Swiss-Prot record:
Sequence ranges of the LRR repeats: 103-125, 128-151, 152-174, 203-218, 219-242, 249-272, 288-314, 315-339, 344-369, 403-414, 415-437, 450-474, 503-518, 519-541, 584-594
Pfam families, per the entry: F-box, LRR_2, LRR_At5g56370
Residues that span the membrane, as ranges: none
Database matches in InterPro entries: F-box-like_dom_sf, F-box_AtFBL13-like, F-box_dom, FBD, FBL60-like, LRR_dom_sf, LRR_FXL15/At3g58940/PEG3-like, LRR_PRU1-like
Protein name: F-box/LRR-repeat protein At3g58980
Residue ranges constituting the F-box domain according to the UniProt record: 1-49
Keywords: Leucine-rich repeat, Repeat
Length: 594
């Protein structure tokens, strides 16, 4: 103890930050010097998904045991599996105790039922600088914000699956009004249509705003006001309402848009010319006139700018434009692009995040929607970047138009999963309007390296073999310190890959197949000698040729068997989990699911 006591105060405080609330409380009685130092607790954390974390009651008791003179800077409470009505009172007592101890950063990552009510003291805390409410698993309802709500120090507010339902006055608007210095507001998994609110997002101090809608089925809300005169960053992924009556975005510098037009207030996918569009983004689009950086993040957004092109203002400050073509249908038209480019007199960089647009049936022609690329003739573009360029005849033909019509072009960056070989020389020989234009090609797989990546989460991702090697395995090989990988909503049958998961460093692996498919993998290999945790929910393939799970401690299995796995009528094969089952021989905890 003497050696530790001789350390500087800063180091001792850092050591304390790794203690639980109860341990910190017990340690505070060791000496007078330690008691004084422990009046500041750097961080408290509870996560019911972490093994050996202890119970929520133990954590609450530890917090309540802290001296009343102590100060807690940060606390994260993550209660998803264990958070049920019997814990509501304990949880709220813990929150109130933290609020009395000068909490600066509070994260309440919880999924609670309709009967849960957040302590009203949260809305009158004078010390909170950052507040995070809700969870990806469901969040909770805020049905009352007190009249005396006052959060004078709050700069960052994150809401996840939070719904506001104050019938007397708009609780959401009241909350924003209580935040005198709010700089950043993030609303994830938002459902306007389930809120009871005024439709006003108003803050004179707000600088960054992120909104993402969770489902787009029916949206009956009619209007949203954006009264945020100091906003510099906007990320909006949402269904477009009937109107944006007030749009005050004069300070906006960067915007990312994923807008979906509604047909009769319902999600209709891509809009047809004969559809009755209930959405109107006119004022929103016009309100973007001062932006410098813009990202149109989906073909749905392309449609919004196309159908309402008359609202597109002159983007006098816009110098960097990104269009994200994440649709698998290359033929989806780009009518919006000429309208936008013509309104960008100072555009310097265009990033096409995805493939170029062309008609696959007529690859050497130009789609009518691009008007022969004539809009490029007056464009001052200097840098063109294409993130998914395969060098097909159709893509080469489209690229020619950019090279031949952009007289100020200085650099073309082409990112590809394909090794060009001799085609690269042909690419460099293409004629250009600018003598200063250089073309650089980047082989994404060849240069793949993620030296610091420890956690990799893939959700609904597919891998295709475009360069003669397994893209998925190439990705794993590029992660020399990978510890955890989570793969959700998989569709193995649509992948082009080797059927192998190989990593020498991987410790935790979760695999969750989306559908019980009629056909499945012939084989799957686990080459993961350091793996200690496996959560495996998938169909059993024809075989497991290699299973290296010698370090496995815990396994959760939900295995499906297909009795008619055939590639064709003459080549049947069956599911065989033999080697997988044998490979589990060292596990200590085994859970089998139906």
């Amino acid at each position: 103890m003497d050696r530790i006591s001789n350390l500087p105060n800063e180091i001792i405080c850092h050591i304390v930050s790794f203690l639980s609330a109860k341990e910190a409380a017990f340690a505070s009685i060791l000496s007078k010097r330690w008691r004084n130092l422990f009046t500041i607790v750097i961080k408290l954390q509870f996560d019911d998904s972490v093994k050996n974390e202890g119970s929520l009651k133990d954590f609450v008791d530890g917090v309540l045991a802290l001296p009343t003179s102590s100060r807690v800077r940060s606390c994260s409470l993550e209660c998803r599996r264990e958070f049920d009505p019997t814990h509501y009172d304990d949880f709220n007592r813990c929150i109130c105790a933290l609020l009395k101890r000068g909490i600066l950063d509070l994260k309440l990552d919880i999924c609670a039922g309709r009967r849960y009510s957040l302590p009203l003291e949260v809305f009158t805390c004078k010390t909170l600088v950052k507040l995070e409410l809700g969870s990806d698993f469901g969040g909770f309802v805020v049905d009352l914000v007190p009249e005396d709500a006052f959060l004078p120090a709050l700069e960052t507010l994150l809401l996840n699956y939070i719904r506001f339902k104050d019938l007397r006055r708009c609780a959401f608007e009241k909350l924003l009004s209580a935040c005198l210095v709010l700089k950043e507001l993030v609303i994830h998994n938002m459902e306007w249509e389930r809120w009871k609110w005024s439709g006003n997002i108003s803050s004179p101090t707000l600088e960054r705003l992120t909104i993402s809608h969770v489902d787009l089925y029916e949206c009956e809300f009619t209007r949203i006001n954006l009264d945020t005169p100091n906003l510099t960053y906007l990320e909006l992924s949402d269904a477009v309402p009937d109107d944006y009556p007030i749009v005050n975005l004069d300070s906006l510098v960067e915007v990312k848009l994923d807008l979906t037009l509604m047909v009769d207030h319902k999600y209709h996918g891509y809009v047809d010319d004969n559809d009755t569009i209930s959405s109107n983004p006119t004022n929103l689009i016009n309100g973007l006139r001062n932006v410098e950086i813009m990202n149109l993040q989906s073909p749905n957004t392309f449609q919004a700018f196309s159908y309402f092109h008359e609202a597109i203002p002159v983007f006098k400050n816009l110098y960097h434009l990104t269009i994200t073509n994440n649709d698998t249908v290359i033929g989806f038209c780009w009518e919006f692009l000429p309208f936008v480019i013509k309104k960008c007199p100072n555009l310097k960089t265009l990033v096409i995040d995805g493939p170029l647009h062309y008609n696959e049936d007529r690859p050497k022609s130009v789609c009518h929607c691009l008007s022969g690329y004539s809009f490029l003739l007056s464009c001052p573009l200097e840098v063109l970047q294409i993130t998914d360029y395969s060098g097909t005849p159709g893509e080469v033909e489209q690229l020619k138009h950019f090279l031949e019509k952009l007289s100020g072009l200085k650099l073309v960056k082409l990112h590809s999963l394909t090794r060009f070989g001799s085609d690269k020389k042909k690419l460099l020989m293409l004629p250009r309007a600018s003598s200063k234009c250089k073309i650089k090609h980047y082989d994404s797989l060849e240069n793949a390296l993620l030296p610091s990546l420890k956690t990799l989460i893939l959700d609904s991702v597919k891998f295709y073999d475009r360069c003669g090697c397994c893209a998925f395995q190439k990705l794993l090989s590029a992660c020399p310190v990978l510890v955890e990988s989570v793969m959700r909503n998989l569709e193995w049958e649509d992948w082009e890959w080797s059927g192998c998961a190989s990593s020498q460093t991987l410790e935790r692996l979760t695999i969750d197949h989306r559908y019980w498919a009629e056909h499945n993998l012939e084989s799957f290999t686990f080459d993961t000698p350091s793996l200690t945790y496996l959560d495996y929910n998938a169909h059993v393939p024809g075989s497991y040729p290699t299973v290296n799970l010698d370090s496995l401690v815990e396994a959760k299995l939900n295995l499906g068997f297909t009795t008619d796995l055939v590639e064709d009528d003459d080549d049947p094969f069956t599911s065989d989990p033999t080697n997988l089952i044998k490979g589990l021989r060292n596990v200590e905890i085994l859970r089998l699911w139906m």
